[in-house]
Amino acid sequence: PPTQTEKPSTDKDTSIDEKPSIEQKPNIEQKPSVDEKPSEEIKPSPENNSNLGEVNDKFMTQVENLIYEKVNEERTKAGLETLSYNTTMEKYARIKSQDMGDNNYFSHEDLSGNLITTQMKNDGVTYRAWGENIAYIGGVSDANALAEQFMTNWMNSQGHRENILSSKFSSIGVGVYKIGNKVYATQEF
């Protein structure tokens, strides 16, 4: 699959896809509902092992929030309107990240050759334009460092940067999934 791998040090593994997905649907009404996403700062710690699943979920939500904030920082720097947070797109971003992690692949197409838009359409989700950025990072466990590395990688890749800074999109959902020492991130526009 088309991937670009950067290894800033021997203990980190990062990868972004070379060709972000963009699909236009000019005759479809609007994007799914939009909700604001609250900010939360929680990191996993050894004393919380009894609730590790819950702590991990909160940690990943923190990374999602930070990525969302960084997307809007980049859009503001570029003189663009900020994106609203879309919980419907968040659902599909989380599904995509978890599917890649659980099934050990890295591609816009799942193991059956389908984009996430196939599942969206099956669920009755409509949109005017759609875009997706995917990436994974290994060996990083700090929420801020993860969000920063994902955004740096995406902003240093022309197609991903174009998705983040596109005027075609008005909302975004972010999904992050951790399995082993890898963290997968998906942006659905």
Feature-to-residue mapping (PLM):
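A well-ordered secondary-structure block
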Residues: 1, 6, 116-188
